[in-house]
């Protein structure tokens, strides 16, 4: 008799939280409580005209030896009422020293500079300053 192995359900790495956004005009699924709090912050900021969540795609060189190109998707792309733009990545400080994260951040900085856009990484320190955590 052949035994069948039960497939385990793959658990998500993130607790996805639904958020109904006024300015994005749709329901968004955050990957963390920090992102959820930032949704609320953006919706309540009168200087924010609109924002998109995980919509921007930035190519970056993942491996110099193989030439492997990957795609980095920052958390937020914000447009302000004065039409200035901002790319935001929300990341715990402890992850900022990881090589892949550094590559993604450098790619976002280059992209932002070439396109006249600001780029910031919001860690727990920045979120505390905004009273979001």
Residue ranges and their predicted role:
Residues 1-133:
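Electrostatic, structured charged patches in enzyme active sites and in nucleic-acid/phosphate-binding
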């Amino acid at each position: 008799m052949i035994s069948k192995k039960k497939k385990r359900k793959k658990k998500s790495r993130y607790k996805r939280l639904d958020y109904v956004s006024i300015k994005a005009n749709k329901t968004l699924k955050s990957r963390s409580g920090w992102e959820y709090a930032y949704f609320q912050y953006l919706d309540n900021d009168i200087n924010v005209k609109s924002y998109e969540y995980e919509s921007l795609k930035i190519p970056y060189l993942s491996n110099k030896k193989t030439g492997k190109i990957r795609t980095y998707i920052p958390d937020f792309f914000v447009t302000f009422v004065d039409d200035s733009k901002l790319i935001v990545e929300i990341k715990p400080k402890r992850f900022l020293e990881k090589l892949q994260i550094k590559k993604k951040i450098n790619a976002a900085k280059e992209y932002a500079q070439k396109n006249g856009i600001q780029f910031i990484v919001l860690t727990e320190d920045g979120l505390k300053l905004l009273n979001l955590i």
